[in-house]
Amino acid sequence: MFRAAAAGPYDEAINKATDENQTSEDWGAIMEICDRVAGDANGPKESVASLIKRLAHRNANVQLYTLEVANALSQNCGKNMHRELSSRAFTDALLKLANDRNTHTQVKAKILERMKDWSDMFKSDPDLGIMYDAFYRLKQSNPTLQPPSAPQKNSLTDQDRQKEEDELQIALKLSLQEEERKKKPAQAAPAAAPSGAGGPATAGPATQQQPAAPIQPMPSGTTAATVSRVRALYDFAPSEPGELEFKKGDVIAVLESVYKDWWRGSLKGKTGIFPLNYVEKLTDPTPDELQREAQMEAEVFAEIKNVEKLLTLLSASNTAPREEDNEEISKFIKARRDYEALLESSMSHPPGPTYHQYAMRPQIPQGYPPPGQNYGAPPPQQQDAQRFYTPAPAQEPSQYPPSSPPPNNFQRPGPGATPAPFYVAGAEVPSQQNQIPPPTPQQQSQQPQQPQYAQRPSEQRVPSGGKQPAPLQTSSSPPPANQYTPYQAPQSSARPQSTYGSGPQELSTSVYDSPIAPQNANPAAPYPPSAYATPDEDPYTAAAASNSSVPTAPTVPPPSVPAPSAPSPELQQPSYGQPYSAYHAHPPQQTPYRAPGGVGVGASGSYDAATVDGPRPHQQQPLPSGLTMSPPPLHPSGPAYDARQSLPSRVGGPSGPGSGGGAPAMGGAPPQPQYKAYVPPGSSSAPGLPPADDGPTAPTAPAAEGYYRTAAY
């Protein structure tokens, strides 16, 4: 609705010819417009449209110059231009401008004058009668705009001549009296000086005998003999030779009377006759007015040096090029402003620290549908080695706040709600959180991995082992502060570098506490299945459904399995009472699980751990080198694979789980029965694993030495 009108082909040229900063008409630009319009078939229509737009300008100079351009087009562009000027659109624009009370009086008079000229020009063509109708309406609505008709040039009668002669005689008589009055005071002044020197008594009566005669003003005459100046009230254009042209406001010097209503005068070096009804008579200035005018003129001439200095400064400043005239300078100024803005914005928002990125393998298409819209994978977060603390018992409250607030998409479920599982970064997330495949039997033999933290979007975590393990991605809601995220086991064919050093971490309890093992807040809620297992690979459901397909783990380890090694001294960390706070998944509601070996879930929903003896701190587990962690891709029809399947426990030979009687916890602490005993890989209970001679096997322990805990799911 407020869209600006499209620019016409003549807008630029007409705008240049009617520039408001011009002091007079630019006839070169006007004649160029006339030539273009005369050679263009659509020129009259397009040019009149541009003229209508310029008439709407609020500057009086623009309006006057536009009328001059229209008059020049009417005289140089033929009948087609006459038809466009007599159109309803152009005449309505003229009437609207003339009837506007804010329009300057001079513009209104010029409109009336041009419409009268065009009416006289178009009167021979009946098709152009719209201009005459518009002129008649304007003259009726504004009678004061039209100047009076010039009087007839009638010769002076004898009576007129006698009246003029009488006025001339009276003026001469008054002039002589004024001269005599000026001479008498001049003669009396020299006579008063000698009489004052001889006797002051005679000077008083002589002065009293000459009363002061009042100065009588000269009566204003009505003839050319007594009137010396007149001021023009209207513009007058001569129609015959010998007439004097003048504009409104010009002061004309009267010379003589030629006709009854026409006088002869002089203006700007030109002499001619002019009608009396176009001017008003001016009274002659009094001596005081003449003296005041002379004083003002002297003041102006006294500042002639300053005037010359000002003219010099103006002429010197105009010669220098302006910045906006130079295109290169304008571009440089704009570029400098952009640079300063960018510099200021970069200083106000400094960039965050940059860390190494995870090495990503080429993704192999595997099994999960696209992720849902409400779950996102938080990027990894930087954590130093000193912050990988072993969590305290579940009954102690967490004293560390989460490293980052949970996203807005997550909601804390109630005790009976079913939360969504968490997934490894780089893997696709299932579209529905209830469609969770069970884990494979290979996941039962897993090495302890670093805990999962809530990650911040702009930071990366570099573990202390020198290698970057695959980050764990969660899409579940945060549980209460006292719960921990379940341990996520690797599944790759090569072992990643652990954040706990070259050996297992020595703990203060008789069992191995997973850094992310949760404490179930709901007694009736079972432990969740693995997020990366297919439905036919869940060790919990598979054991309950088909005991014949999954053999139980032997109670006696093979003789080829070495004893567990002691952890590195620099990575041994005691279990303090202030554990770190991690980003946890709420424990889901699921059927309680009973292990094939008889270890089941208690009434509290936690897992029973096999009692073990103390760890052997004198052996060290071998570590492979040259491994790079990568998030596992998923295949649409196959199981999920993880880079952690390359652990020695995946490559090692057969081994058996540790089982047996319980042992007291280290440091005198009672054993914690809520964890499941560690089930080593390569045993007969885990079918499908590689043979024992493919690589080093995970350390297994007899019944008294099994302090490793298996994967929670």
Curated annotation (Swiss-Prot):
* Region of interest called Disordered, as start-end residue ranges on this chain: 141-165, 179-223, 345-713
Q: What does this protein do?
A: Component of the ESCRT-0 complex which is the sorting receptor for ubiquitinated cargo proteins at the multivesicular body (MVB).
Q: Gene3D superfamilies annotated for this entry?
A: 1.25.40.90, SH3 Domains
Name of protein: Class E vacuolar protein-sorting machinery protein HSE1
Where does the record place the SH3 domain? 225-284
Q: Which GO terms describe its cellular component?
A: endosome membrane; ESCRT-0 complex
Cellular compartments annotated: Endosome membrane
| Pfam families on file | SH3_1, VHS
Task: Report biased composition (Low complexity) as residue ranges.
Answer: 186-195, 202-213, 442-457, 514-524, 680-704
Similarity comment: family membership: Belongs to the STAM family.
Q: Where is the UIM domain?
A: 163-182
Residues in VHS domain copies: 17-146
Describe, as the record does, how this protein assembles with itself and its partners: Component of the ESCRT-0 complex composed of HSE1 and VPS27.
Gene Ontology molecular function terms on file:
phosphatidylinositol binding; ubiquitin binding
- Source domain of life: Eukaryota
The GO biological-process annotations, alphabetized, read as: protein transport to vacuole involved in ubiquitin-dependent protein catabolic process via the multivesicular body sorting pathway
Q: Keywords of this protein's UniProt record, alphabetized?
A: Endosome, Membrane, Protein transport, SH3 domain, Transport
Q: What is its main location?
A: membrane
Q: How does it sit in the membrane?
A: Peripheral membrane protein
